[in-house]
C-alpha cells in the first residue's frame, strides 16, 4: 500500500498567458515489487498503480489576445472578464508507474519512477479558460487527457511490523 501527498504553487509564463496554479493532491495505491532481494536487503524494482485527486485554483494574471491579422504590437490584457481567480477546481486521474528504490539507511530509501497519467474527470466549468495545469498531474490541454512525469524521491518507510520478543 502506498500513499503520497503534496502541495504546489506554480506561476507559469508562456508566449500568450501568465497564470498561477495553487493546490494540493493525494495519491493512493499499491506497488508490486518485482525484485527478489538478497538476505538483509530491502530494495525494490516495482510496478505501481495510483488513484489520485487534486483540489486547486487558477489565477489568470494576464494574457495576450491572439489575432491572425496582427498589425500592431500585442495587447496584454491584465484586467477584465477572463483574468482573476478560478476557484474550487478538482480533478481525478489514474497513474501507472514503474520505478526503483534503494535502501540507503534503515527504513530510508532513495529512488525514482516514471509515471503515465490518464485524467478521469475534472470540474472545470469556467467559461474563462480551460484547464492549464493540475497539481500532481502536471500540464493539461483540451485535446489530451494523458500525461507523464519523472519523479525522484527520498522516502521513509514507517515500520508497522515489530519483532516479537522471546
Language model feature labels by segment:
Residues 1, 24, 41-45, 92, ...:
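Outer-envelope beta-barrel architecture signal
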Residues 2-48:
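Hydrophobic/aromatic-rich structural module bridging two neighboring secondary-structure elements via a short loop
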Residues 6-23, 56-91, 123-131, 137-151:
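Extracellular/periplasm-exposed beta-strand and loop segments of Gram-negative cell-envelope proteins
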Residues 8-12, 33-35, 52-58, 117-123, ...:
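Structural signature of outer-membrane beta-barrel domains
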Residues 28-32, 49-53, 96-102, 112-118, ...:
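Residues on the lipid-exposed face of transmembrane beta-strands in outer-membrane beta-barrel proteins
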Residues 28-76:
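Hydrophobic, well-structured mid-protein blocks that either form specific transmembrane helices
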Residues 35-44, 104-110, 160-166:
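Short loop/turn motifs that connect adjacent beta-strands in outer-membrane beta-barrel proteins
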Residues 144-166:
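Outer-membrane beta-barrel "beta-signal"
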